[in-house]
Amino acid sequence: MNFWGSFKLFFAIAVVTIILGLNGSPLAPQPNQILAHADTTINVQNQGMIGDDKTANNSALQSILTREADKNLTINVPKGVYLFDAGCIKLHSNITFNFDKGATFRTTLGNQVNFVYPSPKAGYNGGISNIKWQGATFQGDNTPSGQSCFAQSIHHGKKIEFNKCTFINAESPGGHYIDLEGSHNIDIKNSTFIGFNGNMDFKEAIQIDYSNPVAMSYKNPGDQYDNLPTYNVKVNNNRFLPIYNSAGQISSYAPNPIGEHAIYNNGKAGIIHDIHFTNNTVVDPKPLTTYGNGNIRFIDVSNLWITNNKFINKKVPRSGNYIYLNNVEQKLKMTNLNIKNNSFTNIDPNTQYIFLTSSNPRNPMHHVNITGNKITSQKNVSFIKSNFSLKSPTIKISKNNAVK
C-alpha cells in the first residue's frame, strides 16, 4: 500500500474512533434517544384463555398483560364467552383489544370485575395511556346472588377509547360502567349501554369525576391522588337502553348516561371541563323525581356540550328533571354551557326539563346557550327553570319548540 493509501486508512480509523469516544457505541441508547416498544399481537386462545362460559379467565388475562407489559400490545379475542370471577385486571399503557363478533367477557353470581388503570404518580401524566377497546362486549346479570358487573376504573388515564362496544346488564348497583377520575382525552363512541339496577338511582353509566379516593370504583393500592378534574371527554353516537321483559315492560331501566355529582376541596385544583355529549340516544331511564337529581346531572362544570341527542320515553310515564346543572360553590364560575338541537319525546317531567341552579344566585352561570331543542309532549311543562335571572346578555334561550 502506498503512502497516501495508508494515510487515508489511518485517517478514517481515527475519525471513527473519535466519534465512538464521544458518543459511545452506535448500538447503545443515547441520553436523548427515545426507545420504541416492540409491537406484539396475540390471540388469547393461544395464551390460555378459554371461551367456554365455564372457565374463569382472570389469571390467564392478567398473565398476558403482565408478561407483555413493555410492549405495544394488540390482543385479539376470538368468538366465545370468556367467564370472569370477581377480581381486578390491571392494565398497562399501549394496549388494543380487538373483539371478534360473538366474543364476550361475562361475569355472574354477583361478581364485580374491575379493569384497573393504575396511577402510581400524581398529575395528568401519572397514569397509563393509549388503551383501545374495539368491539368489546361486557355482560353481567341480575340474579338472587346480586348484580354482576364490570367496571372500568380509569385514574389519570389519557387517550382511552371505547368504540363499538356493548355493555349489557353489567353496571354496578352503586357505581358505573366507565369511571373517569382525573383523566383526559377520552373517546367513547358507537357503543351501547343496556340496563341499570341501581341501589343509588342517580349513578351514571359514564361518571366524569376527580382524582380522589372517594370517587374511585376501585381503589388501587399505591395510586396517588391530587383532586385533578377530568376533562376533554367525547361521548358520541352511543345508545343507552333499558331491558324489557317478555311482556314488553321494563325489567331494567336504561342507565343514566353521563354526569358528575361531587367536587373536592372546593375545586381548587380545577373543575370538570370540555365535556361533549353528542348524537346519542337515551330511552327509558329511571325517573328521578326528587329535588336535586337529574338523568344528566353536572355540578360545577364549564365548557359543556349536550347537543343533537334524542331523549325518549316509551314505557316510562313521567320523568323528573332531565338535565340538571348546579353550581354548589359560592365563588366558582360555570360558563360556556350548551344544550342545543336535542329532541325530547314523551319525557313529561313532573317539574321541568332543564333546571339551572346556583348556591349563590348573585353568581349565575355565564354564556349559556339553550337553543334549537324540540319537545314532543301532550303536557304543558316548563322547559327551563332556574334560581337566577335568565335575562343576562350572555344567556341565550331561543327556538325551543314544543310539538303536540
Positions of predicted regions on the chain:
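Right-handed parallel beta-helix/beta-solenoid
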Residues: 28-61
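N-terminal segments that cap or nucleate solenoid repeat domains
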Residues: 40-42, 57-77, 402-404
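N-terminal extracellular ligand-recognition/capping segment immediately after the signal peptide
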Residues: 48, 58, 70-114, 138
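Extended beta-solenoid/beta-helix repeat architectures
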Residues: 59, 65-66, 91-93, 364, ...
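Extracellular beta-strand/beta-solenoid scaffold signature
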Residues: 61, 85-88, 109-124, 143-154, ...
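Flexible, charged surface loops at secondary-structure boundaries
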Residues: 65-71, 90-91, 127, 154-155
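Right-handed parallel beta-helix
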Residues: 99-103, 126-140, 158-169, 184-197, ...
